[in-house]
Structures are given as C-alpha cells and as structure tokens.
Swiss-Prot record:
Disulfide bonds: none annotated. It is found in: Cell membrane; Cytoplasm; Cytoplasm, Cytoskeleton; Cell junction, Adherens junction. May function as a linker between cadherin adhesion receptors and the cytoskeleton to regulate cell-cell adhesion and differentiation in the nervous system. Required for proper regulation of cortical neuronal migration and neurite growth. It acts as a negative regulator of Arp2/3 complex activity and Arp2/3-mediated actin polymerization. It thereby suppresses excessive actin branching which would impair neurite growth and stability. Regulates morphological plasticity of synapses and cerebellar and hippocampal lamination during development. Functions in the control of startle modulation. Residues 912-939 are annotated as: Disordered. This is Catenin alpha-2. The gene is CTNNA2. Residues 912-927 have a biased composition (Basic and acidic residues). It comes from Homo sapiens (Human). The lineage of its organism: Eukaryota, Metazoa, Chordata, Craniata, Vertebrata. GO terms for biological process: axonogenesis; brain morphogenesis; cell migration; cell-cell adhesion; dendrite morphogenesis; modification of postsynaptic actin cytoskeleton; negative regulation of Arp2/3 complex-mediated actin nucleation; prepulse inhibition. Belongs to the vinculin/alpha-catenin family. InterPro entries: Alpha-catenin/vinculin-like_sf, Alpha_catenin, Vinculin/catenin, Vinculin_CS. Keywords: Cell adhesion, Cell junction, Cell membrane, Cell projection, Cytoplasm, Cytoskeleton, Developmental protein, Differentiation, Disease variant, Lissencephaly, Membrane, Nucleus, Phosphoprotein. It is a peripheral membrane protein.
Amino acid sequence: MTSATSPIILKWDPKSLEIRTLTVERLLEPLVTQVTTLVNTSNKGPSGKKKGRSKKAHVLAASVEQATQNFLEKGEQIAKESQDLKEELVAAVEDVRKQGETMRIASSEFADDPCSSVKRGTMVRAARALLSAVTRLLILADMADVMRLLSHLKIVEEALEAVKNATNEQDLANRFKEFGKEMVKLNYVAARRQQELKDPHCRDEMAAARGALKKNATMLYTASQAFLRHPDVAATRANRDYVFKQVQEAIAGISNAAQATSPTDEAKGHTGIGELAAALNEFDNKIILDPMTFSEARFRPSLEERLESIISGAALMADSSCTRDDRRERIVAECNAVRQALQDLLSEYMNNTGRKEKGDPLNIAIDKMTKKTRDLRRQLRKAVMDHISDSFLETNVPLLVLIEAAKSGNEKEVKEYAQVFREHANKLVEVANLACSISNNEEGVKLVRMAATQIDSLCPQVINAALTLAARPQSKVAQDNMDVFKDQWEKQVRVLTEAVDDITSVDDFLSVSENHILEDVNKCVIALQEGDVDTLDRTAGAIRGRAARVIHIINAEMENYEAGVYTEKVLEATKLLSETVMPRFAEQVEVAIEALSANVPQPFEENEFIDASRLVYDGVRDIRKAVLMIRTPEELEDDSDFEQEDYDVRSRTSVQTEDDQLIAGQSARAIMAQLPQEEKAKIAEQVEIFHQEKSKLDAEVAKWDDSGNDIIVLAKQMCMIMMEMTDFTRGKGPLKNTSDVINAAKKIAEAGSRMDKLARAVADQCPDSACKQDLLAYLQRIALYCHQLNICSKVKAEVQNLGGELIVSGTGVQSTFTTFYEVDCDVIDGGRASQLSTHLPTCAEGAPIGSGSSDSSMLDSATSLIQAAKNLMNAVVLTVKASYVASTKYQKVYGTAAVNSPVVSWKMKAPEKKPLVKREKPEEFQTRVRRGSQKKHISPVQALSEFKAMDSF
C-alpha cells in the first residue's frame, strides 16, 4: 500500500492491451463490428457476377472512418484533462490518427477492387493496427480514470494519517470531519469503478473493501477518542491500532481491485468447496471404472487410500466435543459400511475384468457404493448441524456477561469472562469451518470463511474494549467505545450466522432442532421432578432459543416463495408456535421456577408444565411436516431421520423411564416394516390400487381454486390423512402408533361430517332432482366408509399390570387390526406416583404384539384399512364432481342471483406458483453442462485477438 507521502504508483503495465472494464468493451464493439464486416465483404472469393465497385464496401469504409474520428475527438479531450498520463494519451491519439489514415486509404482501395487478395491483405493489416491503436487509447483513458481514483485514495490516506496524529479530542473531531468528507467522495468514485469492472472477483473485492471502510469508520472515531482520553490504558492503543489497520487494508483493497491486482481467493484460502465434500465428490467419480481397463494393483490402493482419507476427516468430526453419542455411533457405522461397500465393489470389478459391458451385479455394487457415501454425507451433515444448533444458540450471552462485568469495574472477573468469550468466538469459527468442510456451495463457503476470519480478528478487540471499560467504568468515552465494538460484533455474528445458514439445508436444520428440543424437554421434566432450578431455567432458555431460531429461519425461508397454500400452512405453524405455544411454555417455566425457588416449596401442577413442553416439541414437528410437504420422494428419502429416528413423546410426560421403555417396545410402524416380503408385496398391491384412486382425486381437485371452496379443502385434507394411514401399513410415514391411526381416522370422520353438511347445503339448493339424489347417495357412501375406516383402526383392549408383568386381553373386538391403545398406569417411583400415558401394543387376540400375534392377522388388518381408504377416496371424488354439477344446475335455473350467495365458490385454479428463487440442496452445487445456443456472440476482445492471429497476405 502507498504511504501518505509517497507518489501514486500505478500497478498496471501501460503497454498491456488487457481490457478490464465494461465501458472500454462497449466503446470498442461498434468499431470491431464495422471492421469485421468490411473485411468479410469479399471473404467468399471471386464472384461470378460482373465486376465493378462495391457500394457496400465504400459505405462500410466511411463508417469506419467516422468511428475513428469520434475516437480521436474524445481522446484529445481526455488528454487535455489528464494530469498524470498526458504524454501517453497524446501519443496514443496520434497513433490512432496515423493508423486511421492508413486504414482509410487501404479500405478505399479495397472497396474499389474487392476481389484483390493483395488489397484485402493490406486492409486486414491496417485494420489490425487500427484496432490495436484504438484499444490502447481506450485503455489509457481507463488508466486515467484509475489514476483519479488513486488520487482520491491518497487524499483519504493523508486524512487518515491526520486523524491518527490528532493531539486532543477537539483536534480529533475536526480532522475526523474532514476525513468523513473525503470518505464520501472516495465511496462515490469507487462505486462507479466497481460497476465498470469486468472481473467478478475484482467487483467483489471492491465491494468488500468499500464495506470494510464504511464499517470501520465509526469505530475509528470512538477508538481514537478512547485512546486520547485514556492513554494510560494499554487496551485503548490496541483498539485504535486495530481499527487504523482495518481502514488501511480497506484502502489498499480498493486500490488493488481498481487495478485488478487483488490477491486471489486461492491466496487467501477462501476459495473452493469444502475439503470433505470435495473428497467425497472425487471419490464418487473415481469409483466409476471401465472393466476392460480395470487393474486391481492400480486401482485398489488408490481408492482405499482416498476412502481412508475421507474416513479420517469423518472421524475428526465424530470425535468433536459437540457431536452426540448416537450421532458418533452412526458416523462410525456408516464409515464401516462404506469400507465394506468398497470391498464388495472391487470384488465385482475383479469378476468383470476384461468385459466390454458391466454386468448387473457390478451395477448394483456401484449403486450400493454411491448410496453408502450418500448416507455418510447425511450423517456428517447432521453432525455439523448438531454443532451449529448448539454453538449458534444465544450467541450474544457471553458478550453481555463480559460487558456487565466490565461495567462493574471488576478487572479480574472481566479477564475470566474474556476467556469464556474467546472460547465462544473460537467455537463459532470452528463450527463455521466444519460447515464449510461438508458443503458443495462454493460461493457460500467463501462468504462463511470471510465472515469467520472477521470474527477471529474482531474478538481480541472486543475484549480490549471491555478491559478499557473495566479500567474506567465511569468514563462515557469508554462506554461509547464498548457499545461500538459490541454493535460491530453482533452484526458480524449475524453475518456469519446467515452465511452458515445459507450453506446448510433447512431440512437438516429442522430435523436436528426437533431432536435437540426433545432432548431439552426431557431434561426440563427431569430437572422439574428433581427440583433442580438452575438446570430447569438454563434448559428452558435453550428451548426458547431453539424455537426462536426455528421460527426466524423458516420465516426467512418462506420469503423465497410466492404466497400460496404451501407458505400459508408453514407460516400458520410458525405463528402458532410463536404466538400461542411459546408464551404458554414461558409462563409455565416461570410458575415452576417460582414454586421451586420459594423458601417453602409451593405445590404446582406438573402436568401443566409437561403438556406445555410437549406442545413446543409438537409445534416444531408440525413446522417440519409443513415444510416437507413439497419435497420429492427422493428428498424425503434423503431426510431419512424423519422415518427412522424413533422418538416418542408421551401425552402426559416426556420422561423415559425403564418401565416406559419396557412397555413401549417397538412402534407399530416399525413392526409393520418388519413384515415378511410376501406380506409386504400383498400390501404394496393394495397400495397401488389406492394410489390409482388418489390420482383421480388429485386430478379432480387440481382443477379448482380452494379459496372459497371448503369442499375442495376438505377433500385435500382427507386425501392427505388417508395417504398417511396407508403409508403406516408399509412401515413408513408420520404415524408411528396405531393410536395415531385412530386419531387420523377421527380426523377423517370429522372432515367427512363437515363435507356432508356443505354438500347437503348444495343439494338442498339444487333444483335438479336427479343431481340431488346422486349427490345425497355419494354422501351416504362417505358416511359409511368413514365409519368403516374408523372401525378398521380400532380394537378395544384391557391392560393390567400385575407385579410388574403385563397382561393384555382383548374385549369387544371390532376388527383384527392391531393397535397401540393408550392407557394410564401408575408408576411408583420412590413413593411418588406419576401418571404415564403408555402405548401398549395389542392384537385382536389380546396378546402383546411380537409375542404371539400372527402376520396374517396384521396383513388382513392392513389390507382392510387400505380397502376402506380406497373406497372413501372414490366416494370423495364422486362427491366433488356431483357437488360441482349440482352447483351448475342451481346457477342455470336461478341465474346471476345464485352467484351472489353460493354455498361454495367454483373457480378454476390459477397456474401453479413456483419459488422465486430455487433453493438448491448444498450437495447439488456442481458444475452443470448445458447445450449452448447455436448462435454465437463474438465479443470484441475475441474478434481483436483473431485479427492479431491472422497471417499477413
């Protein structure tokens, strides 16, 4: 960087013809086009037509001459105004004039005889020389603009030096005012230059430098003022020197970006996707080999070495302090699975050596290998999200504690809290780098690394500001300095948080947040029962923080979509959590803490607290379900934790006791997933028939706008619930227990009842008796099939717990469908009885599932449920159609009066809305190859280089 007294040095070779700005390119393009057209006039060789003068060539030659004259006039004006490059500009203008005259003569002779290859060659050489001369003139003019910018930078540097040398606060105020004025001028000139730069990297560097200059300007004044007021406090000098260095680096950044000499991202270590992600991508590419050329001695060591390198990186992440034990075990298991898959793949390659085509076993092994690496990626992403969820929670607390200690003037305490704050900052940086390591989003990774670097450099200065305040707690200047550094820290943490959120998946975030909130809810309940106030308060605070972060991120995510049914459902779920659930939870926490903190413990209703905690978990889970509504089956498969993680939240308590786990056993959904393949195949056949009926309903409701049409809304709701019920029979979906299936059946019955009322109102107003009778008949079917579905989902059971031994007997069996029936049982724990609502697996015969229930009984139950759902789906389709037909009859008879007060509004649905911004999954940020347009646009620079490359004639 230039000092305040050194002359301006341009880091740009004046002889270089590299075009660096869009303006030069735009100005050069018309001349290049005209010259190219002129040269190509007779490019096709001699013509069979009568020879003569080419009028078109003469016109083109005249246009080239006029364009050259325009460049000469502008160049002379720039040369007169320039102070630094006057001689070079004058020489360039004369060169353009000379080459322009040569071009005029050559083009005129060529126009008179366009078939002469000699004259054409002479004109091509003249055109090449003219273009080079004009390009050099424009580049020199561009250099003159850069010199003006550098002059502004020099003035700002001098003003900065003056601020640094201020001797008192009044002198500082005056000098800083002048510095501010020069800053405004520099920012204007730099912004113009930024818009003109061709290189995106240089534009980014210029924007970053301008932002840094603006960001540090406020800190510059307060840090300098604190140093002048308290020169005896060493921390004030450290603050001031840091800010001055930041401003100087920003000025140097503007200078380098303006001259296109900025250090590359590679030099700064900010470029590229994450190391672990890149290694996995490369490994996935390397496993695709040609059996004809496969050699075990060549490929086995290479692939095994690559895989072990990946596993080493995964092991480091697994061993990190914030990685949960269960996540660590899953990572280890996936690493072992990947190792085994590679050995299987290599064995298949050996079996296929020398073959032209890959056999089916080899293709299966490749698919398995790819799936295992994908599974490993998922576990690594979840591990990173564990870290993010914990570390980016209540990020301002360590800072606030540090500031409070500083305000009290307790320097010893400040040093202790400074260590905590430093560890917190280091953790943020570490976690941010972990997030980068597994991300494929190159631009996002760059932003995260830059933000993390800023956090790393700012942390010591925040501590210095706190030390200054601790040494002079009564000083307003020290307080102002602390406030400025506090604001800057909070802004930088927000930048880092948003950058990290951009390179991580919302689905992963919701999955991990849901699990963490469940952990915290369990901790809260245990702390409540043990009377541990501190743990209760701290954990409840973590729950509030996690919920607030879920709400913030999901609201921000929905801004990427146009308003519609999807966004309404998601925002409705977030609103319920923020406005209803969380206030109730906070109230119950306050009541519990007050009761436990009293000198004489006050009685309070534990179940109220437990229910409030349960609602928080349910609220987050509902948000996640709403967000996943538009995901594809492939995306949902990738989010397998939604299906596999078997977290149960009991209706009365979330505490998992040994008795609880003994009673719960496996979920009914898990048991359905363990059926024999023959039974699964039969269920799949029934599900396929059900899907055919579903497609009919989808086609019918897709026609209509559901705003103002509750019949369509109810049909969609019933369809969604029936899909969940059929998924349950395959061991999938959100319904875990058959108590969930019972509740789903109740919801369908309620929706069917509401649809019955609406459709009957339509039927009552229908003047056509035939249509009316059809509609009423279909409504009877809905009532019948709703009742049938309800029966298929229930079985009554009586459960007794005698001497710790479960005895289950079926009574009043209405169906053979297996169920988890909720009962309340007293669990005696230390003389204290607590009500636990427990899910008990039972079958029609009354025996516990897994200890005697027959697979055939479960198959019959599943097929009965699917059949009932299919029949109900068909009835809903017919009801929707009949309701529309009845409404049209009503309108035909009564005319426009009917439109004023319809029971439901039948309007065709508008075209489906798409996201304004496609949020790609991080792993999809790979290079895509697309077929280009057949029509090519040749840039002026390319055309110029082609002229340079042409041989002389």
